[in-house]
Amino acid sequence: MKETIEFLIDTVEARQVLDSRGNPTVEAEVFLECGASGRAIVPSGASTGAHEAHELRDGGSKYMGKGVLNAVNKIHETISPALCGLSSLDQIAVDKLMIEIDGTPNKSNLGANSILAVSLATARASANALDIPLYRYLGDPLSNLLPVPLMNVINGGAHAPNSLDFQEFMLVPHGVNNFSESLRMGTEIFHSLKSLLDQKGLSTAVGDEGGFAPNLSSSEEAGDLLLEAIQKAGFKPGEQVSLALDAASTEFYSDGIYKYEGKSLNSSEMISYLSRLVSNYPIVSIEDGLAEDDWEGWSELNKELGNKVQLVGDDLFVTNTERLRKGIMEKSANSILIKVNQIGTLTETLEAIELAKMSGFTSVISHRSGETEDTTIADLSVATRSGQIKTGSLSRSERIAKYNRLLKIEEELGNQARFAGALGLGPKNI
């Protein structure tokens, strides 16, 4: 009786708000019969994969065409009436109904941004009604693993107005016993890096994800700076802190050629270059080392480096189980990046994580470059025991909000909390 009455969805409200880049995005609020409610705000990416679910934008002159009032109206006029009377506890039924109403392969009718906002808000409302944390609602009693953070402290590519082709150069602070110490380590290196950049007369302006965006001559120069910053902060590269890359190779790939740092490279040459980087730096993870549809190249990359480092498919898989299955069959990677707005519902996100886990792939829960104060991904990383999270650098409050949420979760868990880095989990070979 409690489920049939107290957890019934009463109504869904929505509004247009702004993300961290000043672009409109959707916030949804699900209200239950019992009086509980839950809110969620969806993020948006800058370097988006061609196979991602479709964001609904208004077009026209307002907000340079990026308004989302149409998506908000879809929630008010279509989604809310359809969900009224459903149990918020039946997340699968809620998400399935929205997918059925949309009726398109990529959610282009209702919009992935409107569907996702409602999907996440539904889970939040259920957790609030049960008076339990979201990570506990989405997970189980064993959901006590705090993730290793992959901290994007040097931004390039589509995330920054500088000369770097690779999009992210990340710190992976793993050689400590808990998340809070990992965060402290990353923060101290971040400030050490800022000091180094100042000393060298390089810009300390930050990019979309809070990392520095200096004009550097090469990825190697970025790697050298990170190693110097780690040592300057008093830590040991490779032993306590490793490195990770997001090449975002699709952004500089065309007609079978990678236009990288003024050179034209084929897939084999790009793989050889990545292999040299792995040999010369303590790199434990490479994301989107090749382009999203270079399947043959990905298989070769996995043969070359798959037993040495984590090879993460972001644009390659777009949190989509169909593309992930293809990658598993073709042995195209060994890890998947999880971005909830790439697929558009919580249910499909959890399905992708489960498929990855069953297939021996790791999962990295990730933010987007256009973020908000919403902290759902922090809870999701603990709920699913993914062991890894990407949520930006150590500046910009929309990034820090997720780190602060993880600190609170670790505090709530007390002596039950475990840290993936201390257990040798997270990226390969840490």
UniProtKB/Swiss-Prot annotation:
Q: Which GO terms describe its cellular component?
A: cell surface; extracellular region; phosphopyruvate hydratase complex
Per UniProt, the cofactor note for this protein states: Binds a second Mg(2+) ion via substrate during catalysis.
Q: Which GO terms describe its molecular function?
A: magnesium ion binding; phosphopyruvate hydratase activity
Cellular location(s): Cytoplasm; Secreted; Cell surface
Q: Which CDD domains match?
A: enolase
Co-factor requirement: Mg(2+)
PROSITE patterns, sorted = ENOLASE (PS00164)
Q: Which domain of life is it from?
A: Bacteria
Q: Which InterPro entries match?
A: Enolase, Enolase-like_C_sf, Enolase-like_N, Enolase_C, Enolase_CS, Enolase_N
Q: Which residues are (2R)-2-phosphoglycerate-binding?
A: Q167, K339, R368, S369, K390
Any single biological process term in GO: glycolytic process
Q: Does the keyword Cytoplasm apply?
A: yes
Q: Which Pfam families match?
A: Enolase_C, Enolase_N
User: Which residues are listed for Mg(2+) binding in this entry?
Assistant: D246, E287, D314
Catalytic residue list: E209 (proton donor), K339 (proton acceptor)
Q: Known Gene3D superfamilies for this protein?
A: Enolase-like C-terminal domain (3.20.20.120), Enolase-like, N-terminal domain (3.30.390.10)
Pathway named in the protein's UniProt entry: Carbohydrate degradation; glycolysis; pyruvate from D-glyceraldehyde 3-phosphate: step 4/5
User: Per the UniProt record, which EC number(s) apply here?
Assistant: 4.2.1.11
NCBIfam families noted in UniProt? eno
Function noted in UniProt: Catalyzes the reversible conversion of 2-phosphoglycerate (2-PG) into phosphoenolpyruvate (PEP). It is essential for the degradation of carbohydrates via glycolysis.
Q: Which family does it belong to?
A: Belongs to the enolase family.
For this entry, the protein name equals: Enolase
Specify the species.
Answer: Prochlorococcus marinus (strain MIT 9301)
Instruction: Report the gene name.
Output: eno
